[in-house]
Amino acid sequence: MRVRFCTKGNLILVIIEDVEESIEWKTLQKKKQQKIKEKLRIRTKAAVKIQAWWRGTLVRRTLLHAALRAWIIQCWWRMTLSRVLEKKRQAALIAYATRERAVIKLQSLVRMWRVRWRYCQVLNAIYIIQGHWQCHNCQTCALLQGHCVVTATHLQFHIEIINS
């Protein structure tokens, strides 16, 4: 109910409301506010879930990238180590082969020197025998026949005196 009074150019409006209507209206407003709050709470909860899912996805992606980078570095490191080990193995093999060749060469030179030394001994012996034989040959007319065998370890020399 409304009543209007006009006094001295001022308007006075008196409104009398129905209490039941106003209580109903307030309860409706409270219910609307509660529904709005509930919807807002549900939406907030959904937004939080979506944000949590997205953050989890980002973290998983970051961890995956980090794991892949670590794996790549590990592969590179293993390859580098294998190359270094292969170079060391190759160097050791070359050093071993060089030492073996040097040992074989030294052994060959020593064997050659020993055979040459024996050969020189035999040659000196032959010269001595020939010198004595020439003196003896004048006295006896005999013929010398020799045979020489040279092996890796020793030298064999056979001389036969053939009387004619």
UniProtKB/Swiss-Prot annotation:
Keywords (A to Z) from UniProt: Repeat
The keyword Metal-binding is assigned to this record: no
Boundaries of every IQ domain copy: 43-72, 99-128
Molecular functions per Gene Ontology: calmodulin binding
Coiled coil, from the record: none
Claim: Cell membrane is one of the keywords in the record: no
Residues passing through the membrane, by range: none
PANTHER family for this protein: IQ DOMAIN-CONTAINING PROTEIN F2, IQ MOTIF CONTAINING F
Protein name: IQ domain-containing protein F2
Gene: IQCF2
